[in-house]
């Protein structure tokens, strides 16, 4: 029987339950080999109450889950260990160790609970969040986790005295949550939370492995579930179970062992094993092969894409085993690939640029893995031509990591040609042709994308040299682009590559192309392996009408040789192509003087040389597949209709950033554009053409759109169905997605340049009474014959700080989103004059888009207020919901503008709120 609430047992449990959680997975990773697990006893799981509600599990009910045997040499308490932010691969690694990173989430209470929290009465105490199990604690409270017996999900098991091949399974890792998305797996109801950021109430119990969640009450969470095997969730096929990873015991150096070592030393000398294969490692991999599994190794380059890499690592640690996620800045991919080389059906995900992919492919070549694991790509940063070729897109936007893992699992395995480059000095070059700044060696001896020489390499080389000399001047993507443009223009005026044809000789498959090149007089010659080049352009084009050339492939063993004049280089950016020279299997290129060259984007000035290009091998890659091909049609599934009639609705960037985790609110904030009719099997590429024609039809549906603002060229589709939130679809991947997979009756698009009030379907009709309150501005379409106030009058009222006049104009139907010639809004002008009353009025009555509206130089009103040191106005704007992560044309955020104005207090405030915004979004993205 359960004790009553007044009993001593219940009271003692009550005091502990606020901080209690269970980790039922501890026992599968190394329990004491000679002790049988104790049977669950109801006396050890009393019915408990926490703030008036029954809780399902408590610390007191988990004492039967003994911790694993201590590791020799390992620290015995949390306080004696350092706070780790990376996975520990040493022999002293702690079982169930958390992976901490700093966080500013003020809404989450310390996980250890009030009884054990040592910092609850302190102010400004730093907090840490575990990337693998998502608990948040004060930094001083980390050592208290041992007192409540809470460890992170285990990432390995002890070998012990058992047979290492003995089959084992993973148990759930249960964690109490005060905030939880989704629905209870038992009752199907949502997790009701009235005050998300201030509630101490534990509402859910969820597993860090499979992400299943239950209400924290005995009617939903059954006690027997604590020891149930865990399925590892929807990504079980790619998750490497902790039961595969064993911590090995260091061999004992006994006298008998040393004699055996000496006796076998001669045999080891003649062994074919390399030094890496023979040395002892603290961890070994003992996989259990299964045809249904595709275990995944994730390699992340944190330097790629600004700060994207570091954030991506945290997301993968949550979805996967932390010991299958590797930071390439911590030593490269070789150790991990060597350790996992015997895992069957292994796949690799490279998170970074094309250079990161090349690094991993070269390492696979060195290790000679048979068969080589296929490599998928999560593109970070810009460029990413190889990722575009394999349908992974030109960069990472905000696609959920869960969807990325599904794409990697379902992707098609394809081949990629890789080419050897062998350069040697040209013996025929004279001393007058030598250049002191030139080198005899290429930056890379293998390329996957392209090898080029001439104009493009010269521009890239100047950029790299300038960045190495003055790195502080190249910390902005906008500045980098401006430098590229300026260098290209000056190089064009100087004509530094106009005589390229006079100094090179090209022989392809024994045929001399030099006369053809001299007639063409190109300023750039490219040897291309993949269709994409220079951030997505297609220089080979589609030679369907030319019988002399075949369409380009990345697995046919042929290179495409292309020449570029200045005219064809300019046409390349608008869909043109270069001058097709030939397709060949081998190239011999001879240069008679120092010429700039680049190998997959790595430039150098190469001295007069003789360069031979030949096929090296083929790498195995993962190509992102069309989604319908990965989902077979079920018998109860509805057939695709011949035609689809779909409502198109547009979403502004401000609404998307604020609401894309709340589908219903974002749908309400969308602006209807009209209706399109497309074939039932249309992909998004075809649908885009129909949508762009929508507003071009004067008498069509687009003319009746509630908004007259046309679509900007940068609009993209939003997936509203396949995830728990909206997310953007890269334009380069539109051909991979069907309309029926991202929309039902309505399709949503994101327009980053949409300004003005969001049109709603519930706008008042022309017969509705006109609003008289300043809180209800009159839409222009509802004013009949009365002419609306001129925008210039509104601007003047804001400039003169004339609050009454502005209010009067607004009541008369003035558009608070009016802009002047410099694209400055009324809020920009109000901030410039420092008028707090006008600022408050605009924030209360103008559409939310005004908060992040930018003027010509890319400044928002918050940038302006921060630069002027207007602390109160900054507070108003931030509290209204303005983005603190927007950058101006100089690449500065509002916080950086405050720092430049030497207002340290304002900068500290903005930094605090910026972190809060980032953590808020991250918490929502990783919520179960």
From Swiss-Prot:
Residues 257-272 have a biased composition (Basic residues). Its EC number is 2.7.1.107, 2.7.1.93. It catalyses: a 1,2-diacyl-sn-glycerol + ATP = a 1,2-diacyl-sn-glycero-3-phosphate + ADP + H(+); a 1-O-alkyl-sn-glycerol + ATP = a 1-O-alkyl-sn-glycero-3-phosphate + ADP + H(+); 1-O-alkyl-2-acyl-sn-glycerol + ATP = 1-O-alkyl-2-acyl-sn-glycero-3-phosphate + ADP + H(+); 1,2-didecanoyl-sn-glycerol + ATP = 1,2-didecanoyl-sn-glycero-3-phosphate + ADP + H(+). Activated by 1,2-diacyl-sn-glycero-3-phosphate/phosphatidic acid irrespective of its acyl chain composition. Residues 291-425 form the DAGKc domain. Highest levels in brain, and substantial levels in skeletal muscle, heart, and pancreas. Residues 278-416 are annotated as: Mediates interaction with RASGRP1. Residues 1-14, 25-37 have a biased composition (Basic and acidic residues). PANTHER family: DIACYLGLYCEROL KINASE (PTHR11255), DIACYLGLYCEROL KINASE ZETA (PTHR11255:SF43). Belongs to the eukaryotic diacylglycerol kinase family. This is Diacylglycerol kinase zeta. It comes from Homo sapiens (Human). The gene is DGKZ.
């Amino acid at each position: 029987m359960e004790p009553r609430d007044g009993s001593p047992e219940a009271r003692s449990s009550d005091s502990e339950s606020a901080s209690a959680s269970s980790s039922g997975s501890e026992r599968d990773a190394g329990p004491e080999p000679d002790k049988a697990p104790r049977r669950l006893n109801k006396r050890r799981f009393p019915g408990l109450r926490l703030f008036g509600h029954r809780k399902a599990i408590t610390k007191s009910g988990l004492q039967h889950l003994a911790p694993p045997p201590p590791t020799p040499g390992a620290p015995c308490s949390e306080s004696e260990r350092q706070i780790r932010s990376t996975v520990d691969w040493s022999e002293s690694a702690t079982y169930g160790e958390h992976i901490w990173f700093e966080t500013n989430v003020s809404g989450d209470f310390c996980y250890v609970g009030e009884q054990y929290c040592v910092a609850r009465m302190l102010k400004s105490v730093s907090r840490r969040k575990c990337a693998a199990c998502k608990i948040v604690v004060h930094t001083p409270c980390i050592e208290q986790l041992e007192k409540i017996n809470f460890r992170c999900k285990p990432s390995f098991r002890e070998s012990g005295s058992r047979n290492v091949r003995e089959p084992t399974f993973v148990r759930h890792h249960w964690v109490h949550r005060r905030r939880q998305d989704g629905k209870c797996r038992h009752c199907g109801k949502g997790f009701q939370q009235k005050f998300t950021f201030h509630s101490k109430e534990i509402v859910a119990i969820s597993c860090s492995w499979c992400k299943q969640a239950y209400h924290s009450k005995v009617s939903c969470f059954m006690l027997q579930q604590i020891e149930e095997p865990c399925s590892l969730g929807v990504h079980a096929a790619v998750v490497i179970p902790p039961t595969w990873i064993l911590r090995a015991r260091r061999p004992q150096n006994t006298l008998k062992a040393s004699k055996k070592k000496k006796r076998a030393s001669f045999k080891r000398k003649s062994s074919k094993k390399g030094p890496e294969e023979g040395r002892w490692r603290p961890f070994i991999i003992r996989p259990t092969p299964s045809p249904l599994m595709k275990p995944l190794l994730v390699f992340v380059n944190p330097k790629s894409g600004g700060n994207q890499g570091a954030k991506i690592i945290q997301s993968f640690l949550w979805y996967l085993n932390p010991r299958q996620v590797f930071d390439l800045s911590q030593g490269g991919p070789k150790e991990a690939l060597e350790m996992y080389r015997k895992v069957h059906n292994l796949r690799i995900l490279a998170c970074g640029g094309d250079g990161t992919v090349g690094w991993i492919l070269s390492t696979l070549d060195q290790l000679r893995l048979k068969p080589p694991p296929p490599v998928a790509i999560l593109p970070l940063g810009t460029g990413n031509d190889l990722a575009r070729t394999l349908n992974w897109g030109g960069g990472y936007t905000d696609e959920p990591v869960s969807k990325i893992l599904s794409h990697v699992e379902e992707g098609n395995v394809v081949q990629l040609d890789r080419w050897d480059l062998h350069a040697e000095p040209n013996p025929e070059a004279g001393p007058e042709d030598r250049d002191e700044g030139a080198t005899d060696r290429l930056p890379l001896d293998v390329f996957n994308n392209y090898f080029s020489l001439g104009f493009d390499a010269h521009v890239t080389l100047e950029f790299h040299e300038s960045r190495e000399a003055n790195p502080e001047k190249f910390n902005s993507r906008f500045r980098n682009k401006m430098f590229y443009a300026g260098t290209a223009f000056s190089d064009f005026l100087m004509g530094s590559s106009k005589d390229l044809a006079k100094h090179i000789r090209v022989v392809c498959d024994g045929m001399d192309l030099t006369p053809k090149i001299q007639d063409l007089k190109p300023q750039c010659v490219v040897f291309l392996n993949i269709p994409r080049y220079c951030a997505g352009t297609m220089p080979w084009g589609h030679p369907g009408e030319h019988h002399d050339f075949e369409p380009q492939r990345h697995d046919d063993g042929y290179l495409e040789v292309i020449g570029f004049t200045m005219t064809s280089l300019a046409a390349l950016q608008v869909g043109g192509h270069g001058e097709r020279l030939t397709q060949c299997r081998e190239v011999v290129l001879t240069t008679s003087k120092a010429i700039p060259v680049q190998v997959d984007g790595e430039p150098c000035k190469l001295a007069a040389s003789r360069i031979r290009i030949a096929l090296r091998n083929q790498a195995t890659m993962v190509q992102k597949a069309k989604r319908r091909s990965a989902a077979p049609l079920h018998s109860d599934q509805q057939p695709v209709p011949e035609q689809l009639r779909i409502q198109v609705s547009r979403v502004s960037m401000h609404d998307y950033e604020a609401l894309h985790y709340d589908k219903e609110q974002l749908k309400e904030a969308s602006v209807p554009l009209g209706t399109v009719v497309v074939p039932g099997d249309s992909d998004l590429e075809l649908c885009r053409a129909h949508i762009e024609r929508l507003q071009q039809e004067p008498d069509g549906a687009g003319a009746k759109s509630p908004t007259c603002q046309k679509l900007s060229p940068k609009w993209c589709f939003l997936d509203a169905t396949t995830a728990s939130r909206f997310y953007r679809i890269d334009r380069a991947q539109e051909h991979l997605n069907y309309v029926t997979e991202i929309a039902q009756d309505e399709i949503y698009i994101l327009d980053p340049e949409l300004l003005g009030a969001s049109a709603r379907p519930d706008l008042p009709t022309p017969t509705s009474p006109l609003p008289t309150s300043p809180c209800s501005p009159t839409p222009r379409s509802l004013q009949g014959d009365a002419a609306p106030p001129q925008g210039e009058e509104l601007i003047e009222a804001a400039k003169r700080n004339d609050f009454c006049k502005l209010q009067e104009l607004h009541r008369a139907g003035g558009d608070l989103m009016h802009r002047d010639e410099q694209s400055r809004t009324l809020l920009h002008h109000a901030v410039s004059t420092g008028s707090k009353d006008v600022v408050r009025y605009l924030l209360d009555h103008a559409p939310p888009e005004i908060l992040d509206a930018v003027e010509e130089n890319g400044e928002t009103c918050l940038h302006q207020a921060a630069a002027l040191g207007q602390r109160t106005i900054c507070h108003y704007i931030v509290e209204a919901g303005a983005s603190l992560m927007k950058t101006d044309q100089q690449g500065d955020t509002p916080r950086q503008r405050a720092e430049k104005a030497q207002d340290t207090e304002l900068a500290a405030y903005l930094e605090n709120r910026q972190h809060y915004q980032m953590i808020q979004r991250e918490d929502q993205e990783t919520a179960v």
